């Protein structure tokens, strides 16, 4: 069976950025990577009551002893807590875990209807609350499309409705071009913990194509990606070519009809003038003969 690559990792440095931003010696790489895993796990464990409100966790390191954590959420107030109590507790917890200075920032999601992770979290939360998965999926689909999404695909899998055999259910609307690298595809995955087992939710959200962006290649060279020609432009160019061909054919026809450097109409007009001139001359000659006689 064909498998799908993660849409985010496929587009890193094309129209997506890294979620962990740091660079260290290769000897420290595994330790730093493990710290990133611990940071994300501890934050989600601490905020398990509002885990469905977390879209992403970004980690930035400018030096080995300082870590900046950015929590992306559509509800900053619930993450911050009363007078910043949650942030303070999270900072103390992470400092104890990794023994480094922690700085926590909050980034708000302005349009949660166009965030694939938030959509997946919302569906998982409603499925946990025993809502009808068909209604939930169709409602999420219509809401996102009305808010401006160009395409959306949602897939849910597991023991749906408490069935004995696990199966999957999928809804889709619009375009979701997963093989187009310039397409801005947002991807989200969440799990619903039900009495029948875990139900997985996957969301692919197409926000449009990103054109004219400068990116770094694997060799570090800057490449200016030129916009691809749209279908409308191709049709216009095709019509223009047809018009040019028709004009060329008409011109060729006029050239074939020319006689002594004149067009057919001009030749006909000249013949008429010659005929009328000769007719008037014959008439004048006959009048002179009558007068002389």
Curated annotation (Swiss-Prot):
HAMAP family linked: Ribosomal_uS3_B (MF_01309_B)
Protein name as annotated: Small ribosomal subunit protein uS3
Please name the gene that encodes this protein. rpsC
Query: Per its UniProt record, what Gene3D superfamilies does this chain match?
Result: 3.30.300.20, Ribosomal protein S3, C-terminal domain
> Briefly, what is this protein's role?
Binds the lower part of the 30S subunit head. Binds mRNA in the 70S ribosome, positioning it for translation.
Q: Name one GO cellular component term.
A: cytosolic small ribosomal subunit
UniProt KW Lipoprotein keyword: no
Q: Which UniProt keywords apply?
A: Ribonucleoprotein, Ribosomal protein, RNA-binding, rRNA-binding
Member of which family? Answer: Belongs to the universal ribosomal protein uS3 family.
Q: Which SUPFAM superfamilies match?
A: Prokaryotic type KH domain (KH-domain type II), Ribosomal protein S3 C-terminal domain
Cite the record's note on assembly.
Part of the 30S ribosomal subunit. Forms a tight complex with proteins S10 and S14.
Q: One Pfam family for this entry, by name?
A: Ribosomal_S3_C
């Amino acid at each position: 069976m064909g498998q799908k690559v993660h849409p985010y990792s496929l587009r890193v440095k094309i129209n997506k950025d890294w979620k962990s931003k740091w660079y260290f010696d290769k000897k420290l790489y595994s330790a730093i990577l493990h710290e990133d895993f611990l940071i994300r796990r501890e934050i989600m464990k601490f905020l398990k009551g509002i885990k469905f409100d977390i879209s992403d966790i970004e980690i930035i390191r400018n030096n080995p002893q300082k870590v900046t954590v950015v929590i992306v959420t559509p509800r900053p107030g619930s993450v911050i807590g009363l007078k910043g109590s949650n942030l303070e507790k999270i900072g103390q917890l992470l400092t104890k875990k990794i023994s480094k200075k922690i700085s926590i920032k909050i980034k708000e999601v302005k349009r949660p209807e166009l965030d694939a992770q938030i959509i997946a979290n919302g569906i998982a939360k409603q499925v946990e609350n025993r809502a009808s998965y068909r209604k939930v999926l169709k409602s999420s689909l219509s809401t996102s499309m009305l808010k401006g999404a160009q395409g959306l695909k949602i897939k849910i899998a597991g023991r749906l409705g408490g069935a004995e055999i696990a199966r999957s259910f999928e809804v889709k609307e619009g375009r979701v071009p997963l093989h187009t690298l310039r397409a801005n595809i947002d991807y989200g995955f969440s799990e619903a913990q039900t009495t029948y087992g875990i139900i997985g939710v996957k969301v692919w959200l197409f926000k449009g194509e990103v054109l004219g962006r400068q990116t770094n290649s694997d060799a570090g060279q800057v490449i200016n990606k030129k916009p691809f020609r749209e279908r409308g432009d191709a049709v216009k160019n095709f019509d223009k070519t047809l018009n040019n061909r028709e004009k060329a054919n008409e011109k060729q026809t006029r050239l074939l009809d020319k006689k002594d450097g004149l067009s057919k109409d001009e030749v006909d007009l000249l013949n008429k003038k010659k005929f009328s001139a000769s007719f008037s001359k014959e008439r004048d000659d006959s009048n002179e003969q009558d007068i002389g006689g």
